[in-house]
Amino acid sequence: MKKSEMKGYRTHHCNELNLALVGHKAKLCGWVHSKRDHGGLLFIDLRDREGITQVVFHPEKDPPLFAKAKQLKNEFVVKVEGKVVERPAGTKNASIPTGEIELEAESLEILNPSQPLPFNLDEDIENEELRLSFRFLDLRRKKILNCLKVRHLVSSVVREYLSREGFLEVETPILSKSTPEGARDFLVPSRLSPGKFYALPQAPQQYKQLLMVAGIDKYFQIARCFRDEDLRSDRQPEFTQIDLEASFVEVEDIMKWVEEMIQLIFLKVLGIELSLPFVRLTYSEALDNYGSDKPDLRIEWQIQDVGTVFKNTQFKLFRDVIEKGGVIKALNAKGRAPMVNSSALEELVGIATSMGAKGLAHIRVENQEWKSPIVKFFSSEERKELERLLRMEPSDLVLFSAGPREQACLILGKIRLHLAEMTQGIPGNQWKFAWITDFPLFEYSPLEQKWNSVHHPFTRPHPEDLTKLNEGKYDAIRALAYDIVLNGVELGGGSLRIYEKELQEKVFSILGIGKERQELLFGHLLKAFQYGAPPHGGIALGLDRFVMLLTGSESLREVIAFPKNRHGVDLLTQSPSEVDYQQLKELNIQLSFPSIKIEP
């Protein structure tokens, strides 16, 4: 390498040196990953973001340099210059790209020392609170770093694909308007407008619809979103979604773009070519066959309706359910009977009873014999038809749920998933996508005694069901909405939108939002609909959740650089935190919590 090329901190990253560069000079910068003293020779593994290079120090060639190298400790930041040499026979390491060479050190500069680390970067650390408190160190771990690289690659592919398809990336406001009909907003007080507040956006929903009214035609954004809600393992108060919207589209147009984008992501990130199109299931089909609106299609078992088998049954439990208009559903867990002992079965019964069932009837097939307290109530014709319908064989475990359709399906859906997890019935390295369509537009809340949107109030009713709006048959109206599901996890959801002022006002009124409140909260959108709003629709995919699945991570916190913990706290910066009294005074805010003391 020419001398002029040796200026600056480094000439290469720690994954780039190889046999082709033997004899060349190189400069590397990074962190001391490990240090080893082997019979006089001193070795360090030097690590940067891209990889590791072994550096060797010879005591006889440069004693002062060797003495300086002996001072090194793990995670010291150093700059090393030297000559690339081939490793001696028997010392090569095929597990890393630089494993055939080493850098023979000629100079060493310690750029910054390091305190001893609170945990070993090479180990899995169970104490997540400790990791998050030292997140800047946790991010040095290869596993977490890889998650961020995958996240970057996914974002890059999204931008590449959507730009190629004619979408414009447009940023929408972070300081927005509060519309408290959904989840709780994060509020931001305005200093210049005392007593008034911005809200951090839960989604760019209204802005992207306004962009369609503006004639943008195709919009996308990798959008930051905020929701002040109770946290679960798969939730964060701030999250990122791949957001897109387009004008003059049908449902299939949106699905095609999303499928092709995901196909490209899988090819570039995992080297896997997905088959298109993805499976399509209506909401009713998903509920009836899988007991869930986000079915895991890796599990082969399907729920089946066996009501016809027992239409004339003498088994009182089933007969009473049928007479009340209920259903009899069955799940045949193929080959699982030997894997489910009495305690495991009690666990399944507990799931059913927790969801409102009185119990969980079952049949074990042992050889050619059915083991169950209920089979004595079945006629020979019922047994024969049940065996045919469920394809019952030795070692099968059949579970029954009887009651109202939705309840019976949901119970077996949860048991289906739990039983598959319990008996290792979910194949690894499979990617099963599905679109779920034709959701109900509304759902009734007995607690609130009002109708709510299943998705959001801007979702377009199915054209075949529009007359039911005026007839008051709200529970029979389908939505032009669609969710995309991967391996039982909802990746995202979207819909075609309402773009007529009168129809939007009608939906608002069904949801209990009066005219005055409509104008207060959504007047800007209703006004826009009077100026030539085009038909439009879109979707939002959870970027964090998608990357979590792609990397096999257990939590969203693994794929976010600086996440909050389960209590919504950033343990690194200790936020949220108290603020200065003067800041509150400027915002005309007075706290009313006696447990919080802020000194002037």
From Swiss-Prot:
Pfam families: GAD, tRNA-synt_2, tRNA_anti-codon. L-aspartate binds at residues 181, 227, 455, 497. GO terms for cellular component: cytoplasm. It is found in: Cytoplasm. Keywords: Aminoacyl-tRNA synthetase, ATP-binding, Cytoplasm, Ligase, Nucleotide-binding, Protein biosynthesis. GO terms for molecular function: aspartate-tRNA ligase activity; aspartate-tRNA(Asn) ligase activity; ATP binding; nucleic acid binding. NCBIfam families: aspS_bact, PRK00476.1. Aspartyl-tRNA synthetase with relaxed tRNA specificity since it is able to aspartylate not only its cognate tRNA(Asp) but also tRNA(Asn). Reaction proceeds in two steps: L-aspartate is first activated by ATP to form Asp-AMP and then transferred to the acceptor end of tRNA(Asp/Asn). HAMAP family: Asp_tRNA_synth_type1 (MF_00044). Homodimer. This is Aspartate--tRNA(Asp/Asn) ligase. It comes from Methylacidiphilum infernorum (isolate V4). The lineage of its organism: Bacteria, Pseudomonadati, Verrucomicrobiota, Methylacidiphilae, Methylacidiphilales.
